Amino acid sequence: MAVKTGIAIGLNKGKKVTQMTPAPKISYKKGAASNRTKFVRSLVREIAGLSPYERRLIDLIRNSGEKRARKVAKKRLGSFTRAKAKVEEMNNIIAASRRH
């Protein structure tokens, strides 16, 4: 909508007012992890290690490429989008282990 002109006729007729910009809704934050949640998850990952299917994914990525790993991850996780994210996470773990 265009800015009002302050005159009574024309396409943009009406009183000039400053438009209110409401704060974003709290519900828009759904799915974004808080700092505490990130910390707790990293701590659990450090203590508990990888689950068996994650170890298998890493093995598949190293040996037979990502396509097979994605298929296994999709079977385990249910959706292809989550499978791609998990394979990407496992790639990051492999890269981190190479660095150290």
UniProtKB/Swiss-Prot annotation:
It is found in: Cytoplasm. One of its GO terms (biological process) is cytoplasmic translation. InterPro entries: Ribosomal_eL36, Ribosomal_eL36_sf. One of its GO terms (molecular function) is RNA binding. Keywords: Cytoplasm, Ribonucleoprotein, Ribosomal protein. The keyword Cytoplasm applies. One of its GO terms (cellular component) is cytosol. Component of the ribosome, a large ribonucleoprotein complex responsible for the synthesis of proteins in the cell. The small ribosomal subunit (SSU) binds messenger RNAs (mRNAs) and translates the encoded message by selecting cognate aminoacyl-transfer RNA (tRNA) molecules. The large subunit (LSU) contains the ribosomal catalytic site termed the peptidyl transferase center (PTC), which catalyzes the formation of peptide bonds, thereby polymerizing the amino acids delivered by tRNAs into a polypeptide chain. Belongs to the eukaryotic ribosomal protein eL36 family. Present with 5370 molecules/cell in log phase SD medium. There are 2 genes for eL36 in yeast. Component of the large ribosomal subunit (LSU). Mature yeast ribosomes consist of a small (40S) and a large (60S) subunit. The 40S small subunit contains 1 molecule of ribosomal RNA (18S rRNA) and 33 different proteins (encoded by 57 genes). The large 60S subunit contains 3 rRNA molecules (25S, 5.8S and 5S rRNA) and 46 different proteins (encoded by 81 genes). This is Large ribosomal subunit protein eL36B. It comes from Saccharomyces cerevisiae (strain ATCC 204508 / S288c) (Baker's yeast).
